[in-house]
Swiss-Prot record:
Gene name of the encoded protein: ispE
Residues that bind ATP: 100-110
The protein's name in its UniProt record: 4-diphosphocytidyl-2-C-methyl-D-erythritol kinase
Domain of life: Bacteria
Pathway, per record: Isoprenoid biosynthesis; isopentenyl diphosphate biosynthesis via DXP pathway; isopentenyl diphosphate from 1-deoxy-D-xylulose 5-phosphate: step 3/6
Protein species of origin: Prochlorococcus marinus (strain MIT 9312)
Reactions mediated catalytically: 4-CDP-2-C-methyl-D-erythritol + ATP = 4-CDP-2-C-methyl-D-erythritol 2-phosphate + ADP + H(+)
UniProt feature coiled coil, ranges: none
BP terms from Gene Ontology: isopentenyl diphosphate biosynthetic process, methylerythritol 4-phosphate pathway; terpenoid biosynthetic process
Length: 311
């Protein structure tokens, strides 16, 4: 019989950026109707899972700014999976945190999905991707994206996914002021207050927006496109109210080889795209001190073809 107490699993849990974020309307369930393109990047957290026979979920981390109790998404995800699967085992979980918190990079959602995927294997549950996505959607709107990973069209409140095929090799520079965070809920509320008169309710019009993103979303991001651009509706709210975001976007716009720049999610992290990782590294090396002096942490990374992976 397998000694389950010695079984360990390690997982890489990557962040995401939004290559398109369009707020279409308000749904009957209170969430917003969205049309997005989300892309995994190789700024990642790492999680280690080990079975315990106590039937408890125990979370530890190298990050002192995180709650490790039942309100943590990792713990919530583990308890949900354990309850739905009706098993007696628990798990000891260690999180090594690299993705900044409250940054618009969805580190918490990535960790949640990594927990579902990791414990599904650790506990030998054999749940398929569809079942994991169903559980993920009850925990958060963008968690199903991380179950699938890579680059995806995301519709509905973010849980309706369509896989995109791309081989983008862009380099990415990220900027975030470590002392600044943005509330996603508050940002959507402010956006709604300003732009609710533009919201669509007609299903045919909403489907036309989805169709347009399916057909043109990747073309808008293609290196051959002379007008390479990224749309983020939430930036209209956050940039005007947050000097840190406004300055980050300005700094990125002035980088010599920047192809385009935007805010990710509800912010405050901002990013710029470059033709390849080598160009991005050179730009960061040349500007690192400037970014630091202006109060920003900075990272350079690439796009990932896959999301959460076992290591």
């Amino acid at each position: 019989m397998q000694d389950l107490a010695k079984t360990k699993i390690n997982i890489k849990s990557p962040a995401k950026i939004n290559l398109h974020l369009e707020v279409i309307g308000k749904r009957e369930d209170g969430f917003h109707e969205l049309a997005m393109i989300m892309q995994n990047i190789d700024l990642s957290d790492y999680l280690e899972f080990e079975i315990n026979n106590e039937g408890l979920i125990k979370l530890e981390s190298d990050c002192n700014d995180l709650s490790l109790s039942d309100d943590n998404l990792i713990v919530k995800s583990a308890n949900l999976l354990r309850k739905k699967s009706n098993i007696d085992y628990g798990a000891n979980i260690f999180l090594r945190k690299n993705i900044p918190i409250g940054a618009g990079l969805a580190g918490g959602s990535s960790n949640s999905a990594a927990t579902l995927i990791g414990l599904n294997k650790l506990w030998d549950l054999n749940l398929g991707q569809e079942a994991l996505c169903s559980l993920a959607s009850t925990l958060g709107s963008d968690i199903p994206f991380f179950i699938n990973g890579g680059i995806q069209l995301c519709f509905g409140r973010g849980e309706v996914l369509e896989k995109l095929d791309s081989n983008f090799e862009y380099g990415v520079i990220l900027l975030k002021n470590p002392n600044v965070s943005v509330s996603t809920a508050e940002t959507y509320k402010k956006y709604s207050n300003r732009f609710c008169h533009q919201y669509l309710t007609d299903r045919e019009m909403i489907e036309n927006i989805r169709k347009n993103l399916r057909e043109n979303g990747l073309n808008n991001l293609n290196l051959d496109n002379q007008h390479l651009s990224i749309k983020n509706d939430l930036q209209l709210v956050v940039e005007n109210e947050n000097d840190s975001v406004k300055q980050a976007l300005y700094l990125l716009s002035k980088l010599e080889n920047c192809l385009t720049f935007s805010m990710s999610g509800s912010g405050p992290t901002c990013f710029a795209l470059f033709k390849d990782i080598e160009t991005a590294k050179k730009e960061l090396t040349a500007n690192y001190k400037l970014f630091r002096n202006k109060g920003y942490d900075s990272w350079v990374c690439t796009f990932l073809e896959k999301g959460i992976t076992f290591i």
